Regions:
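Low-complexity, compositionally biased segments
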Residues: 5, 57-60, 107
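A mature extracytoplasmic/lumenal domain signature
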Residues: 34-40, 87-91, 100, 104
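Mature extracytoplasmic domains of secretory-pathway proteins
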Residues: 22-74
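N-proximal, solvent-exposed amphipathic alpha-helical segments enriched in charged/polar residues
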Residues: 1-29, 37-40
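A short amphipathic beta-strand at an alpha->beta junction
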Residues: 60-96
Length: 107
Protein backbone atom coordinates (compact mmCIF):
# COMPACT_ATOMS: atom_id res chain seq x y z
CA UNK A 1 0.00 0.00 0.00
CA UNK A 2 1.02 3.55 -0.53
CA UNK A 3 0.69 4.50 3.13
CA UNK A 4 2.98 6.24 5.53
CA UNK A 5 2.58 5.56 9.24
CA UNK A 6 2.79 8.60 11.48
CA UNK A 7 3.25 7.11 14.88
CA UNK A 8 1.45 9.20 17.40
CA UNK A 9 1.11 6.67 19.22
CA UNK A 10 -1.43 7.76 21.73
CA UNK A 11 -2.61 5.53 24.55
CA UNK A 12 -6.36 6.02 24.81
CA UNK A 13 -6.46 3.77 27.83
CA UNK A 14 -4.46 0.80 29.07
CA UNK A 15 -5.99 -1.43 26.39
CA UNK A 16 -6.12 0.72 23.24
CA UNK A 17 -3.36 2.58 21.40
CA UNK A 18 -4.14 4.93 18.50
CA UNK A 19 -1.95 5.39 15.43
CA UNK A 20 -2.64 7.83 12.61
CA UNK A 21 -1.99 6.54 9.12
CA UNK A 22 -1.87 9.04 6.29
CA UNK A 23 -2.84 7.63 2.91
CA UNK A 24 -0.83 9.49 0.28
CA UNK A 25 -2.47 8.03 -2.84
CA UNK A 26 -6.04 9.02 -2.01
CA UNK A 27 -6.20 12.51 -0.57
CA UNK A 28 -9.85 12.09 0.44
CA UNK A 29 -9.25 9.46 3.12
CA UNK A 30 -7.59 9.80 6.49
CA UNK A 31 -6.84 6.50 8.18
CA UNK A 32 -6.49 5.57 11.80
CA UNK A 33 -5.34 2.28 13.27
CA UNK A 34 -6.27 1.08 16.73
CA UNK A 35 -4.25 -1.60 18.46
CA UNK A 36 -6.23 -3.41 21.13
CA UNK A 37 -4.53 -5.33 23.93
CA UNK A 38 -6.75 -8.26 24.94
CA UNK A 39 -5.00 -8.81 28.29
CA UNK A 40 -5.71 -5.24 29.36
CA UNK A 41 -9.38 -5.74 28.55
CA UNK A 42 -9.45 -8.84 30.73
CA UNK A 43 -9.82 -11.10 27.69
CA UNK A 44 -7.76 -13.75 26.00
CA UNK A 45 -6.67 -13.11 22.42
CA UNK A 46 -9.15 -15.79 21.33
CA UNK A 47 -12.02 -14.06 23.18
CA UNK A 48 -11.09 -10.70 21.67
CA UNK A 49 -11.08 -12.09 18.14
CA UNK A 50 -14.35 -13.98 18.78
CA UNK A 51 -16.00 -10.76 19.97
CA UNK A 52 -14.52 -8.58 17.25
CA UNK A 53 -17.86 -7.65 15.66
CA UNK A 54 -19.19 -6.26 18.94
CA UNK A 55 -16.00 -4.24 19.56
CA UNK A 56 -16.04 -2.94 15.98
CA UNK A 57 -19.73 -1.96 16.17
CA UNK A 58 -19.24 -0.16 19.49
CA UNK A 59 -16.23 1.81 18.24
CA UNK A 60 -18.04 2.72 15.02
CA UNK A 61 -21.03 4.11 16.93
CA UNK A 62 -18.67 6.06 19.19
CA UNK A 63 -16.87 7.53 16.17
CA UNK A 64 -20.10 8.42 14.38
CA UNK A 65 -21.21 10.47 17.39
CA UNK A 66 -17.77 12.03 17.85
CA UNK A 67 -16.87 12.80 14.22
CA UNK A 68 -20.32 14.20 13.42
CA UNK A 69 -20.40 16.57 16.41
CA UNK A 70 -16.84 17.97 16.59
CA UNK A 71 -17.03 21.02 14.28
CA UNK A 72 -13.58 20.76 12.69
CA UNK A 73 -14.03 17.05 11.91
CA UNK A 74 -17.62 17.53 10.72
CA UNK A 75 -16.36 20.21 8.33
CA UNK A 76 -13.90 17.70 6.85
CA UNK A 77 -16.70 15.16 6.43
CA UNK A 78 -18.91 17.80 4.78
CA UNK A 79 -16.28 18.56 2.13
CA UNK A 80 -15.89 14.88 1.27
CA UNK A 81 -13.05 13.62 3.44
CA UNK A 82 -13.72 10.14 4.82
CA UNK A 83 -12.17 8.49 7.86
CA UNK A 84 -11.09 4.85 7.66
CA UNK A 85 -10.55 3.05 10.94
CA UNK A 86 -8.74 -0.30 11.23
CA UNK A 87 -8.59 -2.31 14.45
CA UNK A 88 -5.92 -4.92 15.14
CA UNK A 89 -4.97 -6.83 18.24
CA UNK A 90 -1.60 -6.39 19.94
CA UNK A 91 -0.74 -9.78 18.39
CA UNK A 92 -1.54 -8.46 14.89
CA UNK A 93 -4.85 -10.29 14.49
CA UNK A 94 -7.48 -8.48 12.44
CA UNK A 95 -10.35 -7.26 14.62
CA UNK A 96 -12.31 -5.02 12.27
CA UNK A 97 -12.53 -1.93 10.10
CA UNK A 98 -15.08 0.66 9.05
CA UNK A 99 -15.36 3.99 7.32
CA UNK A 100 -17.09 7.15 8.52
CA UNK A 101 -18.34 9.52 5.82
CA UNK A 102 -20.69 12.48 5.46
CA UNK A 103 -23.72 10.18 5.08
CA UNK A 104 -23.14 8.78 8.58
CA UNK A 105 -23.99 12.20 10.02
CA UNK A 106 -27.45 12.31 8.47
CA UNK A 107 -30.09 11.12 10.92
Amino acid sequence: TNAKKKVLPQKLNKAITLYKVEYIKDGNVVGYAYEVNADNLGLTEKELVAGKQNLTDNLREHHKRYFCTVPVIRMELDIGIDFLINIISANDNYVGSYQISKDDCIN
